[in-house]
């Protein structure tokens, strides 16, 4: 639910119908922006787009301050659809540029030959990071972003393919730290 006083979405409500957080997580905010941007970019229903537009306009300013990679990636994936319909929105273009650079800079700082990744660990919804960077690299005509995204995505796909050929996401009981062992169980449903 959107909190107009903070300009952020909240995610956790208790059984007593009270919010468990005053502001809301950046993950929840990024996911909400992704959903709203997809509605704005794809929906043919004017009423639905009007409702999404009001929330999107109120919620977007918070995205310019994102420093966490996953909320940035969620927002970027949504902005790809949004800018497909509204390519002249300078504020959205600026936010896309800043968040795409955030991802690319994280990759450049951390990636190594044996660890072509954005962070020193793999945790949850990992594929969204290269997904977002790939979309941005293609739409912004930035080959460096495309190359980094494809290197990371290829490595992740190999890493998360079990011996039998099936998908085996990183478990959340310890995740997978560089030079460590990947957690093979207790995967999250979001994967």
What would you call each of these model-derived segments?
Residues 1-191:
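Glycan-recognition and catalytic cores of secretory/periplasmic carbohydrate-active enzymes
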């Amino acid at each position: 639910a959107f909190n107009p006083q903070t300009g952020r979405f909240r995610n956790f409500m208790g059984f007593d119908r009270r919010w468990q957080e005053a502001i809301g997580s950046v993950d929840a905010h990024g996911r909400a922006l992704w959903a709203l941007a997809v509605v704005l970019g794809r929906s043919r229903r004017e009423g639905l787009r009007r409702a999404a537009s009001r929330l999107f306009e109120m919620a977007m300013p918070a995205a310019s301050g994102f420093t966490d990679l996953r909320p940035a990636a969620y927002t970027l994936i949504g902005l790809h659809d949004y800018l497909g319909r509204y390519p002249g929105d300078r504020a959205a273009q600026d936010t896309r540029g800043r968040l795409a650079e955030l991802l690319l800079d994280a990759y450049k700082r951390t990636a190594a030959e044996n660890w072509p990744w954005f962070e020193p660990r793999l945790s949850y919804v990992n594929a969204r990071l290269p997904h977002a960077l790939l979309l941005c690299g293609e739409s912004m005509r930035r080959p460096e972003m495309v190359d980094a995204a494809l290197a990371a995505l290829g490595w992740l796909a190999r890493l998360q393919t079990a011996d039998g050929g099936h998908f085996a996401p990183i478990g959340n009981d310890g995740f997978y730290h560089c030079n460590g062992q990947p957690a093979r169980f207790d995967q999250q449903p979001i994967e």
